[in-house]
Structures are given as structure tokens and as C-alpha cells.
Amino acid sequence: MKALVRVAVTGAAGQIGYSLLFRIAAGEMFGKDRPVILQMLELPDEKAQAALKGVMMELEDCAFPLLAGMVVTDNPDIAFKDADAALLVGSRPRGPGMERKDLLMENAKIFTAQGAALNKVARRDVKVLVVGNPANTNAYIAMKSAPDLNPKHFTAMLRLDHNRALSQLSTKLGKPVANIEKLIVWGNHSPTMYPDYRFATADGTPIIEAINDQAWNANSFIPTVSKRGAAIIEARGLSSAASAANAAIDHMRDWLLGSNGKWITMGVPSDGSYGIPEGMIFGFPVTTTNGEYSIVKDLPIDTFSKTYIDKTLAELEEERASIAHLLR
């Protein structure tokens, strides 16, 4: 057995948390040879804490061989203590009549506090994935609130968008998703994201040779991927939970265990690539090895793509400006 890993999960009794915890305990995130301690955080109210205790009871009843221990708490300093990985799933959802700027402010308070707690008690090499929306800006806030931690280790989840785009291409081409490579989702995890298959291949053949159809790209593919979350809410009455948890597993597994040379999409702090301001958390194509990621460099950006990338960048800049006063 490899060394024990401590993984903190916020919003642990929520729908995504419930879909995620059992898969982590089964070894799907860190490997089948890595024991885990789950450190679960929920809101400090009686109902949330009771639900969290129920989740813990179910985890006990699964008798997972790799589950070496559990912590349930409403205190971030306890949840993040010595954490090797932190999945920040919990966030304030948008309520009726709530403006986007109000949502940003409410979440800024949460992620400022969680970033500070990580800075105080987590391992110095902790790897952080923000799932709670608005994920990119929440990750940026947490990163800025943890000045003693490696900023490269604060990431936002765009893997759900990446997986959604893979599925749409698979259906269009009649090819298995496993045979499709070099897909990218640029930018913000929001409807402004830009799924880009210009470099993608299926069975090694460029996809643009099979789908040379800019109308389908602009009028079907991009809108379907970018509005998929809303379509699921309309159909199910609830937001994506199992698919979001699955994407979080994919993101962390590939980051920690390596992507074997394959391109994946991660929201990571920009190093200035593609004209994205340094430090902005932005969806890029990356490869991963030995627990670190590298942005795929020097891809040509055509006029069509630049229009979409500029739009998602403008949204992120607006979000960042709206919370800047909280980070001074």
C-alpha cells in the first residue's frame, strides 16, 4: 500500500458530495493502492450536520478497504488539517432574484475564508480543485487568500465541459469517446466557455476532416456544450451532480496520476500563454505528469476562436474586477 492521503471535501452532504465521496473511498481518485481519510465539511447548521452524519454512516456501511478514517465537521481548520487534496464543492447557489454580482460577493466570503484556512493548516503541497460555482473566480479568490501555498496548485473544474464536448463529438462521429484526443475547452466554466475541436483527432484522424461544418460548430456544438447544465436542470429539476462528481474524479486522477501524454482541460492560473493575463484562472489544454501539469503551448488561434476566447476572458476579467476590493 502507498502512503495515506487526506482529502478534504466541502459541501460534503450535498448532491455532488454524495456522488463523489463513495467513489473516492473506493479508490477511483487516488488509485486502488492508496488508503484515504475523508475530511468532510458542511455548514454549521443542524440539518446539514445531521445529513453529513448520515453520509458518514453510509460510508461506514460500505466497508471500503481503502477508507482509513473519516472526519465530519463544520470547521474549515479541522476539515483542511494536513490535507493533501481539497475539493471545494460547496458554494452559495444563485437564489431567485439574485444578481450575478451578489452571487460573486456571497461566494467571495466563503472562498476567502476557505483559502485562509488552507493557508493555515493544509499541507504545503496541497492540491486544490474548486467545483463550486462560479468555479474559476472562486478558485482565484481561494488562491489569493492562501499566499503561502503554491498558486499553481489552485485549479477550477472545466472537466465536466470537456467531457460534455467529448460526448457530443462521439455522437456526431459515431466513434467511442476513448478514441477522441486533443479536445480543448477554453476559458470560464460558464456559458461563455469555448469548446474547440480544431486540433482534435478520432482514431488519429483530424476531426475537422470529418466535420468540416462551421455552421454545426457555431449553431449546434458550442451552444449544446455551453448550455448543457441548464438543459439538465430543466429536464431533471436539479443541477448536474453525478456527472460533476465524475468530472472531479477525472480531473484529480489525471492531475495526480498523469494523463499519459493526452490533452485534458483544467482551469489553471495563466502563465501568460495565449495572451491570458498571468494569474487568471482560465481553461487551458494541459498534459500532466508526476503530479504537475503543463499548458500546451503555441497552438494557432484563428479569428473565429479568438472571438470566443476574448468573450470568455472579458467575463472573467469582469468577475475578477467585481471582487478585487475584497482581496486587498
Curated annotation (Swiss-Prot):
Pfam families noted in UniProt: Ldh_1_C, Ldh_1_N
Q: Please provide the Gene Ontology terms (biological process) for this protein.
A: malate metabolic process; tricarboxylic acid cycle
Q: Which UniProt keywords apply?
A: NAD, Oxidoreductase, Tricarboxylic acid cycle
* Domain of life assignment: Bacteria
The enzyme's main class, written as a single word, is oxidoreductase
| Residues binding substrate | 94, 100, 133, 164
Active-site positions, per UniProt? 189
Its UniProt entry gives the catalysed reaction(s) as: (S)-malate + NAD(+) = oxaloacetate + NADH + H(+)
EC numbers, comma separated: 1.1.1.37
Read off the InterPro entries from this record: L-lactate/malate_DH (IPR001557), Lactate/malate_DH_C (IPR022383), Lactate/malate_DH_N (IPR001236), Lactate_DH/Glyco_Ohase_4_C (IPR015955), Malate_DH_type2 (IPR010945), NAD(P)-bd_dom_sf (IPR036291)
Molecular function in Gene Ontology? L-malate dehydrogenase (NAD+) activity
Where NAD(+) is bound, by residue? 11-17, 107, 114, 131-133
PANTHER family the record matches: MALATE DEHYDROGENASE
What role is this protein assigned?
Catalyzes the reversible oxidation of malate to oxaloacetate.
Family named by the database record: Belongs to the LDH/MDH superfamily. MDH type 2 family.
Its recorded name reads Malate dehydrogenase
